[in-house]
Amino acid sequence: MNIPVVRSSRADSSDSSARTLLEATGPGFLMCAYLGRLPAAMNQLGLLLVVSSAGRSLALAGAVVAAVGLGTAFGAPVIGRLHDHLGAWRVTCGALLIQTAALVVIWCAVSRALPDWIILAAGAVMGMANPQAGSVARAVWSSIARATDQPARALRIIRIGMGWETAADETSFVIGPVAAGGLISLLGAQGTVVALGVLTLIGEGMFVIWLSIHRDVVRPQRGRARFDSDRSRAHPTTTGAVVSEMLPVLVVIMGVGVVFGTTQTALTSVHAAHGTPGLTGPIYGSMGITSALVGFASPGLRVGRLRKTALGGIVVLLCSSTLMGVPSAIATEAVILCLGAAVGMTLVTCYSRVEELAPAGRVTGAMTVASTGNVLGVSLGSLVTGAIGDNLHLGNLPAAVAGAGMVVVALGEAGRAALRRRR
């Protein structure tokens, strides 16, 4: 297999981001990787709507969503390690088959009134079998970047690639829920399960095909040696040192997850109290738009990693504090757009750092650990905000605390770096 060749150019500094994307991977990868992550964005809300529309209790519907989320959180690190050891195409193919089987079980349970625990178990299996397409895609960018012996070019590919993946994640989590809602309206509960299965086969199946054609795309290659050796001189190589460097980044990623979970739950509570529940989805979804745009553009900003993290935390703190005042819908929308920009920049910065620290051959595993931190953060934010209850003014407090925590982490890393330089 030939990995798409990264072409050199004297005008690298003036290359557009879009051109760099296409030169590095080609349009086939961009399309297949995007389609591969859509089922994960669609299935969770889709199952909630399927269960509730099938006449089952809302409590069961919520429990199914929780089962999918917990399954994903527990399964992601295992899936990531399997990707690194067995090859991405094999693991993704196996995960696709398991997810399809789980959807068949859910269809049978819904259509034949089988016990609730069967739906819960199938939902948990679906979550555990999530192929982590986003993490695999990020590992592909890492593999391509490490295949070049031009460090400046490699760094540009990583930054733009991580920006693109964040944009892809955010837009998929806007498109996915909208598509799930449309399916349930058009096809009903049983038809939606069938449609989810077909779309999962198509989306993840196309990604499997791309990965099978480029089978060694995420495996260590001889061409990476020079780039990796350059990185090793500047970054820790022992396991303990890598964990020490990566832990603050994972804390920030989890903090971003708290912002997502808190904001979604708080908006739901506010609009339910105001009698405008239909506004929750569009307003929350708009955060994904600015997150995607800024996430894609932020790698071009000539600002250091810790400064970006601190700036993102400050904006999150200010925006979440503003939302605690329960502003009007228009003002809330403006604040949400700013909040999206902050989390988009922060996520790209963090994922780029995770790639930088990950040892060769373990990039996918590192990315899935980071994604798991984000998922756990979402769950934590939703849980705490839900526990706050009907106090609309305190609903966004967990997100504000998370923003302050990001600033503290950035300052702590900066202080530690300063101490090292003095030694």
What are these model-predicted stretches?
Residues 47, 131-149, 267, 345-358:
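Intracellular juxtamembrane helix-capping segments at the cytosolic ends
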Residues 10-73, 236-285, 349:
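Helix-loop boundary and gating motifs at the non-cytosolic
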Residues 34, 115-133, 254, 331-345:
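Hydrophobic core of transmembrane alpha-helices in multi-pass small-molecule transporters
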Residues 74-88, 184, 293-307, 389:
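Helix-to-loop junctions at the C-terminal end of transmembrane segments
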Residues 97-114, 208, 315-327:
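C-terminal ends and interior cores of transmembrane alpha-helices
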Residues 122-169:
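Cytoplasmic helix-loop-helix junction between adjacent transmembrane helices
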Residues 307-350:
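C-terminal transmembrane helical hairpin of 12-TM major facilitator-type secondary transporters
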Residues 361-392:
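A late C-terminal transmembrane helix in Major Facilitator Superfamily
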